Amino acid sequence: MTKKRIAVIGGGVSGLSSIKCCVEEGLEPVCFERTDDIGGLWRFQENPEEGRASIYKSVIINTSKEMMCFSDYPIPDHYPNFMHNAQVLEYFRMYAKEFDLLKYIRFKTTVCSVKKQPDFATSGQWEVVTESEGKKEMNVFDGVMVCTGHHTNAHLPLESFPGIEKFKGQYFHSRDYKNPEGFTGKRVIIIGIGNSGGDLAVEISQTAKQVFLSTRRGAWILNRVGDYGYPADVLFSSRLTHFIWKICGQSLANKYLEKKINQRFDHEMFGLKPKHRALSQHPTLNDDLPNRIISGLVKVKGNVKEFTETAAIFEDGSREDDIDAVIFATGYSFDFPFLEDSVKVVKNKISLYKKVFPPNLERPTLAIIGLIQPLGAIMPISELQGRWATQVFKGLKTLPSQSEMMAEISKAQEEIDKRYVESQRHTIQGDYIDTMEELADLVGVRPNLLSLAFTDPKLALHLLLGPCTPIHYRVQGPGKWDGARKAILTTDDRIRKPLMTRVVERSSSMTSTMTIGKFMLALAFFAIIIAYF
């Protein structure tokens, strides 16, 4: 039987994992990457490319290595927990080499259009027109996986800032920022307090005369380094913690989180406290920002009302003169210009079943991969989406009726609207564990903690109490990986390894305390398992 051919659009992280998912399901992937290399967002370049997100030279990823790795390919133990962008890209290269993925990629090839075949209602096939070196080519595919991400088009709302056209200094979007060298001795305004805005404020303040961080709403600032030096996302991403938070509800969870955040520094005193709750925004992670603020090198300001030739006037009436540069860290928008009307994006909103499948197609042969902004790592979600999509393409899984899918899409959108502050930034939000467990159920790889409690209690304990890493979804079901158990049980070793650069005598009291703690947890384990289910 002839293998089904699947077009994979984009050679970034979602594209790489999608290629591998196709191969694992016996499909034939052909990946189109318009640049000459893999990596997508994580491939640093001095000169930004149109239609592709661009990172600055110093970017450190916000999710730790255990939470962001591919499910059957742990990141090397000597790599730091939070990696520089060059190390992230190197990991992707290692992954592509390990699973021989590059042979499926056609580099320097742009996808011009993706259209239904005339007999789409029965065949589900697509006509894909591509261009390479000035030559266009049309091929027919049995399925399409769109892996172009959501950091594609810089969102630059200049119309919201009267007078900017008169401003004599330089102004640009954060995608065009590369390093702080050109800002020595200057007075700089950063507009926006997302992750890019916070990072740029910190970095530029090391050379600038003064940095002003302008924010409309304020933000809750989380840090990468959590209690006892563990990565914060590792500490907050266990199934048990997630279960407890579900029981407590959003109100108590917000109260606890805000108290913990304010113990680090008082957000009201630092001028950052927003009106919304901590879990009503996509997290802004920055370990250094409070230090720059308390040192006076970064000053927090409200929203800019208008610009003059050399100054910024803020909504509270205050004014800052002699401004040399304005950087708009105002995020991105996304679209799919090569797709026909079957997929529409309106104000950064898109209707997708489980954030993957358009509900209005006669045949489920088009999947959007990685179009989610999770409270956690996106890589493992993209991978699980790919595993599910390829099962659907192959006919191993089916989708509900169009009406059922539309009803669920509406419900999911209502939940987003209810929880999050209205913002272009929050249109594709999703909780990490909820999303992973939901996708794992669809794929058939969610670990059965109840059965494992009797057959492998040690592993079950780690699955419940430890961080919910991507490797959990290789323990059972399709695509099971023989190395999953060992990798899960050695998670803590990989976290500690890069920090062990000096021999330190371990406290005996700490060791005994940990032993007692583990014993108590073991005693309560079966009760917890039963409660969880």
From Swiss-Prot:
NADP(+) binds at S196, G197, G198, D199. Acts as a Baeyer-Villiger monooxygenase on a broad range of substrates. Catalyzes the insertion of an oxygen atom into a carbon-carbon bond adjacent to a carbonyl, which converts ketones to esters. Active on diverse carbonyl compounds, whereas soft nucleophiles are mostly non- or poorly reactive. In contrast with other forms of FMO it is non- or poorly active on 'classical' substrates such as drugs, pesticides, and dietary components containing soft nucleophilic heteroatoms. Able to oxidize drug molecules bearing a carbonyl group on an aliphatic chain, such as nabumetone and pentoxifylline. InterPro entries: FAD/NAD-bd_sf, Flavin_mOase, Flavin_mOase-like, Flavin_mOase_5, FMO-like. Its cofactor is FAD. The modification Phosphotyrosine is found at Y56. It catalyses: N,N-dimethylaniline + NADPH + O2 + H(+) = N,N-dimethylaniline N-oxide + NADP(+) + H2O; NADPH + O2 + H(+) = H2O2 + NADP(+); heptan-2-one + NADPH + O2 + H(+) = pentyl acetate + NADP(+) + H2O; octan-3-one + NADPH + O2 + H(+) = pentyl propanoate + NADP(+) + H2O. PANTHER family: DIMETHYLANILINE MONOOXYGENASE (PTHR23023). One of its GO terms (cellular component) is endoplasmic reticulum. This is Flavin-containing monooxygenase 5. Its EC number is 1.14.13.-, 1.14.13.8, 1.6.3.1. It comes from Homo sapiens. Belongs to the FMO family. The modification Dimethylated arginine is found at R5. It comes from the Eukaryota. The keyword Transit peptide does not apply. FAD binds at G10, G11, G12, V13, S14, E33, L41, W42, N62, T63. One of its GO terms (molecular function) is flavin adenine dinucleotide binding. GO terms for biological process: lipid metabolic process; regulation of cholesterol metabolic process; xenobiotic metabolic process. Expressed in fetal and adult liver. The chain crosses the membrane at residues 513-533. Keywords: Endoplasmic reticulum, FAD, Flavoprotein, Lipid metabolism, Membrane, Methylation, Microsome, Monooxygenase, NADP, Oxidoreductase, Phosphoprotein, Transmembrane, Transmembrane helix. The modification Phosphothreonine is found at T284. It is found in: Microsome membrane; Endoplasmic reticulum membrane. It holds the Pfam family FMO-like. The modification Phosphoserine is found at S54, S58, S280, S401.
